[in-house]
Amino acid sequence: MKKFIRENIDHQPIVDNVFKIVNLANDAIAKKGKENIVNATIGSLYDEDGNLVALDTVFNTYNSLDNRTKAKYASSFSGNPNFRKQVYNWVVQDTKLDLCHSVIGTPGGSGAVSSTILNVLDEGQTLIIPHIAWGNYKSMATIANCKVQAYQMFDGDAFNITSFKETCREVMARQGKVLAIINDPCHNPTGYSMTVEEWNQVIDFCNELSNEGPVIILDLSLIHI
């Protein structure tokens, strides 16, 4: 009998490691007390009493808007011009960078990552991710009929720049372009944030590798944490 779903779909259950680690942290808190455990496992901001932070400046402003304004379509499927301008200003902050850029509104960070994979990689090409990663990266690649190749994220307590370079060079030689995910800062699920020196090494390498083909790195979704 024919299967209803695609033949090449990944039938493995999705396991999001961050929630496994969250459960371990919660178990440790229950056993040892919250004063003895720092839970830095998930991308949420909590106050000193352990309560989820919901900023009044955000929600009060949103709630003050007329419901018709909130329900109205944007002027373009890529987002209102003022929204796109503010997103770019938020990304570059006060660096005064004048980058060639285009901003597109997506349904959340997941939509941004998924859209990038679909628009950058052809079917059968490879997405590069860290060996410890958010489980949905692989799912997004599978949906796009793409493969996944992982670099070892850590060398001891530091970012494994050697493994990252080796993996990127291998993929570049095979397909002529690189789409790599570095989830930083506050990497999901480890919470690791790369140092300025580590980022300088990555940037220098990517500038060098870009002589062989396009190089794209993404996912700063937790930069606000």
Residue spans for each PLM region:
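Generic N-terminal amphipathic, Lys/Arg-enriched alpha-helix
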Residues: M1-H11
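Short, exposed beta-strand "edge-strand" segments with a Pro/Gly-rich flavor and a Y/T-containing core
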Residues: K3, N51-V53, N188-M194
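N-terminal small-domain helix-loop-helix segment of the aminotransferase-like
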Residues: H11-G108
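A cross-domain feature marking catalytic cores of carbohydrate-active enzymes
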Residues: I42, D184, L218-L220
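Conserved core of the PLP fold type I
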Residues: T69-V215
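Conserved Walker B
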Residues: V103, L220-S221
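Conserved small/polar residues in nucleotide/adenosyl-binding loops
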Residues: I223-I225
